[in-house]
């Protein structure tokens, strides 16, 4: 095992990232060292690149970033069982305490003591990453690595989309970023009748259509209610997935839900968003906040891909990790889906 490795690092407090040589992590008791094959750039990685307020509050440079990845086990720490060296794996990015009430009920995503890989501790944009064995997820060899590289984001979409029953339902998704687009595919796969996605970025709507949604609406140019009529909706949407964190999108979503409709909220806003409580109460709406993934979502993701859910339309760019700057430029251009970095060459 070599002692030094390439890694994409947040070097100092300020915009930008650097490719540096850093020590290869050594797995302690109960930990697993993973050799990285592919990684994917997440929106939070872009926040760290730009060094926005959220990043300033969470990241302590110098630090290796990144939390979406697939690879193989390189070394097992003392006491680790159930895994083998060379086995293909990914990992849950929230390292949790395991003893709080939420952890005990299986809601690890709400653990108040969680530590984020690539945010609060060194991450996966490197040749190797080290995580606790309980966070390691075995990945079947039949699954394409480019897709598995963004299972973390896929998990957010899965958690959001499957929060409420979908069979025969009409679904509105506000926000056609990669997670929103993936959610559109999940909803159709899970039996939704009509799936409509909205955005004001024309580029993002085309891959949403390739994922199988019934209508992709640019709300800056098109009338959503007209599209609803064309799709045969008479009372509004049964299920809403708010993925944008945008106030205007949220308010429009609430306005077109049927009475008794259910809404999953994943998109984080830049600030507080006002809510008309009277509208929610009188229409009997259910609003559910979504954060991260439940461990069962990892199994659901693998089974959906094995069952035929094709997520490749979400991938728009592929680069070698040494060209990571091109990947971040693509992400920040507003004209990208998932960007995958290759660490195998």
Named regions from a protein language model:
Residues 7-26, 43-75, 90, 111-122:
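N-terminal glycine-rich cofactor-binding segment
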Residues 97-174:
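NAD(P)H dinucleotide-binding glycine-rich loop of Rossmann-like/cofactor-binding domains
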Residues 257-258:
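Helix-to-beta-strand junctions that scaffold the AdoMet/dcAdoMet cofactor pocket
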Residues 25-39, 54-101, 140-142:
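Glycine-rich beta-strand-centered segment in the early N-terminal region that forms part
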Residues 261:
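Glycine-centered, small-residue-biased loops immediately flanking beta-strands
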Residues 226-234, 270-317, 325-326, 335-336:
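C-terminal substrate-binding/catalytic core of Rossmann-like NAD(P)-dependent dehydrogenases/reductases
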Residues 143-221:
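Mid-domain Rossmann-like dinucleotide-binding core that forms the NAD(H)/NADP(H) cofactor-binding site
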